[in-house]
């Protein structure tokens, strides 16, 4: 399913309506806000065609993670007794909503032009169904021996319980779609009648399929695979970190653009995955390594499940398994060599002790001299440890700006706790200049996508690229609390990777949730160089116009060697005279406030980098 289609389906839940003109207007508004330019007539026509053609069926799955503020309170493997006491009441409210959330996941259907009737039908079936005897909260709290249900177990029990309603829903859906085919207005043109009938026929057939055991089992199996995939991801720390950054940014985005239907309760996230493709991939490979990695890619990179994404995943997993096998063999070899070295060293020490014993018999030493020497050595060692401890107390502020050490500290040794070191590429520093100078450099540069941009476009791009103050955070000891590193890849003979954090960009009273992207590569001197730095709004990623996922491998930046001779370590960096920005550091946020240079009391915009979600 295309990224446009996913966005349209997302909007159905937000708008609580399905009039096509209203959806187009909402898409237009969000697209223009995200990309900071007006859509052309051709672009609007593409949107219209996409919305008119798409019919959203059997694509939704529930992601078994629950956030409360900046805390992750439920993971796939969380049991009720594992939940922090202060969060249990909130968690139980979320779990109580599972029946309606699961029902929405199973039956959410987007009908181009008018979905009101399907939404009304969905609500009617749910409200007239008795849930007597099924209480997900009681189920979750129940323990058998010392072990209770995991959150994914409760989710799946709820799915299986709700599947019983699908027969009634499917029958009514097919009946009403059939009736609407007979009622198609004669005032429509032949082409419009054809489109309307085709769409309703698809829905009628889908309703009939929902009554079949095969379709019901497919829905259950798809959600079960997602739950298992999320558990697989959760148990791999390197994957968990990236997954949580993406999930947390989606959670924050949903809070800024949607009004909660359940008051102060934040429901679990949903994603759009083709059920049939997911199930068939699992049936083909029977490997959670492959399916778990595939779902991770789909979730992080916004990809569809198709032959290309499946093949890429299979190759990636096999390469990783081979690398892990080679690494394991190398570690075993090193352990064997180390054991042999230790054995030889022990043998040499024993022989040395024997030779010392023989020497003492021939020549006696001065009484107590050995004890004095040992004491002196111990005092010297303690003195060195105190000196090293003092060295480690270099302040974060000094390290962030590359400042000199305090005079009281030794200048002969380097602090072990010094922050991260990064050089900054010319293409990043370019954005600190005026829009006119940036345009001149881009027009003469080798990057085709940046040529011939208007001054207005450059000024808008400058807002999200001129965030060089983020380097202060990147170089600090706190960087790992805000950013995760992605997998590394090779391009043009250089090793590249990204660091990604969650950010909120504010301007003119509007907030945009997104990610702070940092692109890095390893230079010939084995140093880390920042060649890409920007804030990317979630709406920009959803719009998909030339936008790449923050977690996707690869990029379109070439010719890094062009600016390699003009790298900077950003020590003591200052903006040109007259430009003002202020850094505000808090416990869980790093905020950059940009002010009007002519009137510093006026805030133009701000960027807040948020600490990673806390896992309870």
UniProtKB/Swiss-Prot annotation:
<feature type="compositionally biased region" description="Basic and acidic residues">
    <location>
        <begin position="374"/>
        <end position="383"/>
    </location>
</feature>
<feature type="compositionally biased region" description="Basic and acidic residues">
    <location>
        <begin position="347"/>
        <end position="356"/>
    </location>
</feature>
<feature type="compositionally biased region" description="Acidic residues">
    <location>
        <begin position="384"/>
        <end position="396"/>
    </location>
</feature>
<dbReference type="Pfam" id="PF12376">
    <property type="entry name" value="DUF3654"/>
</dbReference>
<comment type="similarity">
    <text>Belongs to the UPF0329 family.</text>
</comment>
<feature type="compositionally biased region" description="Basic and acidic residues">
    <location>
        <begin position="319"/>
        <end position="340"/>
    </location>
</feature>
<feature type="compositionally biased region" description="Basic residues">
    <location>
        <begin position="410"/>
        <end position="422"/>
    </location>
</feature>
<protein>
    <recommendedName>
        <fullName>UPF0329 protein ECU10_1810</fullName>
    </recommendedName>
</protein>
<dbReference type="InterPro" id="IPR011667">
    <property type="entry name" value="UPF0329"/>
</dbReference>
<dbReference type="InterPro" id="IPR022115">
    <property type="entry name" value="DUF3654"/>
</dbReference>
<feature type="region of interest" description="Disordered">
    <location>
        <begin position="319"/>
        <end position="422"/>
    </location>
</feature>
<dbReference type="Pfam" id="PF07753">
    <property type="entry name" value="DUF1609"/>
</dbReference>
<feature type="compositionally biased region" description="Basic residues">
    <location>
        <begin position="357"/>
        <end position="366"/>
    </location>
</feature>
């Amino acid at each position: 399913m295309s990224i446009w289609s996913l966005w349209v389906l997302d909007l159905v839940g937000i708008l609580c309506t399905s009039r096509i003109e209203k959806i187009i207007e909402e898409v237009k508004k969000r697209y223009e806000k995200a990309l900071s330019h007006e859509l052309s007539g051709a672009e609007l026509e593409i949107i219209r065609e996409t919305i008119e053609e798409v019919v959203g069926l059997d694509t939704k799955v529930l992601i078994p993670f629950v956030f409360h503020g900046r805390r992750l309170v439920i993971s796939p493997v969380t049991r009720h007794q594992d939940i922090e006491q202060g969060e249990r009441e909130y968690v139980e409210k979320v779990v109580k909503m599972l029946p309606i959330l699961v029902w929405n996941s199973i039956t959410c259907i987007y009908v181009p032009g008018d979905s009101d009737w399907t939404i009304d039908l969905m609500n009617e079936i749910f409200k007239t169904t008795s849930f007597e005897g099924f209480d997900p909260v009681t189920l979750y709290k129940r323990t058998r021996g010392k072990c209770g249900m995991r959150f994914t177990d409760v989710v799946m029990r709820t799915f299986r319980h709700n599947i019983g309603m699908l027969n009634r829903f499917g029958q009514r859906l097919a009946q009403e779609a059939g009736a609407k085919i007979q009622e198609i207005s004669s005032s429509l043109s032949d082409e419009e009648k054809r489109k309307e009938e085709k769409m309703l026929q698809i829905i009628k057939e889908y309703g009939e399929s929902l009554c079949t055991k095969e379709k019901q089992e497919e829905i259950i199996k798809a959600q079960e695979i997602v739950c298992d995939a999320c558990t697989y991801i959760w148990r791999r720390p390197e994957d968990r970190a990236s997954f949580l950054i993406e999930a947390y940014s989606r959670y924050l985005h949903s809070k800024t653009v949607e009004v909660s239907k359940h008051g102060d309760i934040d429901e679990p996230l949903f994603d759009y995955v083709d059920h049939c493709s997911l199930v068939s991939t699992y049936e083909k490979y029977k490997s959670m390594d492959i399916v778990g990695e595939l779902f991770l890619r789909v979730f992080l990179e916004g990809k569809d499940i198709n032959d290309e994404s499946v093949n890429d995943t299979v190759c990636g997993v096999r390469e990783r398994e081979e690398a892990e096998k080679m690494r394991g063999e190398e570690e075993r070899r090193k352990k064997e060599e180390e054991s042999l070295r230790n054995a030889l060293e022990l043998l040499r020490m024993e022989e040395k002790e024997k030779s010392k014993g023989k020497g003492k018999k021939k020549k006696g030493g001065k009484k107590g001299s050995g004890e004095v020497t040992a004491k002196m050595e111990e005092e010297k060692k303690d003195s060195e440890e105190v000196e090293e401890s003092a060295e480690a107390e270099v302040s974060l502020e000094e390290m962030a700006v590359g400042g000199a050490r305090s005079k009281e500290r030794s200048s002969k040794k380097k602090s072990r706790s010094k922050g991260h070191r990064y050089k900054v590429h010319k293409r990043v520093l370019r954005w600190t200049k005026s829009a006119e100078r940036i345009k001149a450099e881009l027009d003469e540069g080798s990057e085709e996508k940046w040529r011939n941009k208007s001054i207005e476009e450059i000024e808008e791009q400058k807002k999200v690229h001129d965030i060089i103050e983020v380097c202060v955070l990147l170089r600090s000891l706190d960087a790992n609390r805000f950013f995760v590193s992605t997998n590394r890849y090779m391009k043009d003979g250089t090793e590249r990777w990204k660091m990604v954090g969650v950010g909120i960009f504010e301007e003119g009273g509007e907030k945009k949730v997104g990610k702070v992207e940092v692109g890095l590569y390893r230079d010939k001197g084995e140093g880390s160089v920042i060649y890409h730095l920007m804030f990317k709004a979630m709406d920009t990623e959803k719009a998909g116009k030339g936008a790449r996922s923050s977690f996707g491998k690869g990029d379109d930046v070439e010719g890094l060697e062009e600016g390699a001779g003009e790298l900077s370590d950003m020590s003591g960096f200052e903006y040109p005279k007259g430009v003002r920005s202020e850094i505000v550091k808090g416990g869980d946020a790093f905020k950059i406030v940009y002010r009007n240079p002519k009137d510093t009391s006026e805030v133009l915009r701000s960027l807040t980098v948020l600490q990673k979600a806390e896992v309870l």
